[in-house]
């Protein structure tokens, strides 16, 4: 499945990566597979919509991960 990374999550990983899909994989497993600390992900989308990282994913899903955004 395709995982799109944004901002600081791209460092040493690139804009998009492929993660091997298996039955029952969820967003938390994807984040862990990429070596990302769960607290480093602020926005989690599946196919462009807000999603729960505990929900199982489909092989054709596109996951997007965003870090916390700051500024003022």
Model-derived features with residue positions:
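Ubiquitin-like/PB1-type beta-grasp interaction modules and other compact soluble beta-rich domains
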Residues: 1-71
């Amino acid at each position: 499945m395709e995982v799109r990374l944004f901002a600081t999550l791209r460092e040493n990983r690139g804009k998009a990566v492929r993660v091997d899909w298996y039955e029952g994989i969820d967003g938390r497993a994807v984040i862990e597979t990429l070596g990302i600390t769960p607290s480093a992900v602020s926005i989690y989308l599946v196919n462009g919509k807000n999603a729960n990282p505990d929900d199982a994913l489909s092989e054709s899903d596109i996951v997007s991960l965003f870090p916390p955004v700051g500024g003022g």
